[in-house]
Design a protein with these regions (language model features):
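Short acidic helix/loop segment immediately C-terminal to the autophosphorylated histidine
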Residues: 49-55
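Conserved glycine-rich
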Residues: 219-222
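Amphipathic coiled-coil signaling helices used for dimeric signal transmission
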Residues: 1-22
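Short conserved segment of the HATPase_c
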Residues: 180-192
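Conserved catalytic submotifs in the C-terminal HATPase_c
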Residues: 92-97, 114-115, 119-129
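Short alpha-helical segment of the dimerization/phosphotransfer core of two-component systems
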Residues: 66-71
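Short helix-loop "hinge" at the ATP-lid/N-box region of the Bergerat-fold HATPase_c
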Residues: 148-149
Length: 241
């Protein structure tokens, strides 16, 4: 009887795995089909924003542009996540300066911080080398910065810290925003999970899931510290090899 139970259980696991694969493939196929017409809509909306058109029409065009931009980002993240989960991405590991990469990512967010009146502090070494896929790691830093901006109120501060010793490098992105409950922390790396529904329109719940897959691909770790009303701190741990 026990043998039959084990066989039935294994069969159920296989079926659930097949359902998950079908669901992921469906998302991927639909995303590919939507990508091209969405790009056309986005490009035309951008052109309308630049044309000499009445102010009200420009406002409508801007709404279309921003909405299609968010959808494009969602589709890109779905496709990347699908490839990572299927292990269809082979990381191209090369040695590069991590501090230089972090500085470049931070500079890209300067206009956003200024617009939202958010302070930024950085505490890093002059240079530290790692061997990894730079393009994939850039996704991680951009997602962490994007999250920090999203949940930090005007007048708040975001802090970037990089430290290293003989065994590992630790990179932290910390904000003093709304923070998270313990329940949210448990699920924060799950696909499409959004703990704070008041910020639902600002993201799609895929950024941290995507970041985790990239880090797992490199055998890196990520830790989260957070308290409601006191902000959040994400720390990526990169072992030295």
């Amino acid at each position: 009887y026990l043998d039959v139970m084990i066989i039935d259980f294994n069969k159920m696991v296989e079926e659930l795995g097949s359902i998950e694969t079908l669901k992921t493939d469906f998302f991927s196929n639909v995303s590919h089909e939507i990508k091209t017409p969405l790009a056309i809509i986005q490009n035309n909306a951008e052109l309308l924003c630049m044309e000499k058109t009445p102010e009200k029409q420009k406002e409508y065009a801007e709404v279309i542009f921003q909405t299609t931009k968010r959808l494009s980002e969602l589709i890109s993240n779905i496709l990347k996540l699908n490839k990572l989960e299927k292990q269809a991405i082979t990381p191209v590991a090369e040695e590069y300066d991590l501090c230089g990469q972090l500085a470049e990512c931070a500079v890209n967010y300067e206009p956003v911080w200024e617009k939202k009146d958010i302070g930024f502090d950085a505490d890093m070494e002059d240079s530290v080398k790692i061997t990894a896929d730079a393009a994939l790691m850039e996704l991680v830093w951009n997602n962490l910065f994007s999250n920090a901006v999203k949940f930090t109120e005007p007048g708040g501060t975001i802090k970037l810290t990089e430290q290293s010793d003989d065994s590992e490098i630790r990179v932290s992105v910390e904000d003093n925003g709304c923070g998270m409950t313990e329940e949210t922390r448990k699920h924060i790396f799950e696909k499409f999970y959004q703990g704070d529904t008041s910020h639902a329109m600002a993201g799609n719940g895929l950024g941290l899931a995507l970041s985790l897959r990239v880090l797992q691909l490199n055998d890196y770790k990520i830790e989260v510290e957070s308290e409601p009303g006191r902000g959040s701190k994400f720390t990526v741990i990169i072992p030295k090899r």
